[in-house]
């Protein structure tokens, strides 16, 4: 059960809370997806939890429910070139800051352990296991990113993106060695740096 400390603090006053989380900091290829979510005041759904604790089927079900129920949500998709230009930490921070500055009415923004230079933003360690708004954002980000990678699997079936979603599994590294790197790869990541770029 999520403790929802800040929701319990602000909801009784009729004030909205925004949660922000990301998916895709670790993969070797594909985008980083950052999502924000503002759930209705006093919203309840005991199934919503940190996306990493949920099955793929459950995440997909909750994605549809959150999209339907949310007061507001938004996505930022950060492409590999931007990740390489800024580094993954600063690319994540930049996207979260932009989402936190939304003009949609909310009293405070909660992030999952990402400090942002904004007095209305609170970074919470393991926030996706503490706040329903962050947990909802984590589900939105994870499901959207997985679907993007499944789309790339159609374009590049030889890499097996549908299975590993771009993470550095043994199978994925073997496919990188066999086929080289396409434009989806993050060249600032060490496993990519040591492999030759495949030109198209």
Where are the model-predicted features located?
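RNase H-like, Mg2+-dependent phosphodiesterase core
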Residues: 1-200
